[in-house]
UniProtKB/Swiss-Prot annotation:
This is Pleiotrophin-B. GO terms for biological process: defense response to bacterium; positive regulation of cell division; positive regulation of cell population proliferation; response to bacterium. Residues 141-161 are annotated as: Chondroitin sulfate A binding. The keyword ATP-binding does not apply. The gene is ptn-b. Residues 136-161 are annotated as: Disordered. Residues 86-93, 117-125 are annotated as: Chondroitin sulfate binding. It comes from Xenopus laevis (African clawed frog). Residues 1-23 form the signal peptide. Disulfide bonds join 41-70, 49-79, 56-83, 93-125, 103-135. GO terms for cellular component: extracellular region; extracellular space.
């Protein structure tokens, strides 16, 4: 009786071992097939960011890709256009700008150049761009100084209270 019970346990153990090995192999095959399907998909191509309202702030962009076995070929992504972007260059084109040049007395303008730093989402960008602005006195530092004085005055008032 013990001999039959031992053989039964041995057979059961062998069966479980075979099933475990077979289960592992089929799992690997499934994973490899999934990898093949993923590699069949093309790269995502993204449209420009379209603001929800106005010409800056939160918006969306649409992405597309090709491939026979791709489950998802179109998707929408949230994006943001900074409100201080240079509209004529596009939100996806980021430039490194030089310092402003001297004022041209004939045109009344000063200029500076920018070199392309980064093109986001496969955007087509100009390699170099030029900005111009009217010459004039810079009043912003004076405004900042007056704001500091106001803050100092408020702080003194708080200390007196």
């Amino acid at each position: 009786m013990h001999h039959q019970h031992g053989l039964f346990m041995l057979a059961l153990l062998a069966f479980l071992l075979v099933m475990t090995v077979l289960g592992t192999d089929t799992g690997k095959k499934d994973k490899q097939e999934k990898k093949v399907k993923k590699s069949d998909c093309g790269d995502w191509q993204w449209s420009v960011c379209v603001p929800t309202s106005g010409d800056c702030g939160l918006g969306t962009r649409e992405g597309t890709r090709s491939g026979k076995e791709c489950k998802q070929t179109i998707k929408t992504q949230k994006c943001k256009i900074p409100c201080n972007w240079k509209k004529q260059f596009g939100a996806e084109c980021k430039y490194q700008f030089q310092e402003w040049g001297d004022c041209d007395p004939e045109t009344g303008l000063k200029t500076r150049n920018g070199n392309l730093k980064r093109a986001l989402h496969n955007a087509e960008c100009q390699k170099t761009v030029t900005l111009s602005k009217p010459c004039g006195k810079v009043t912003k530092p004076k405004l900042q100084e007056s704001k500091k004085k106001k803050k100092e005055g408020k702080n003194k008032e708080k200390l007196l209270d």
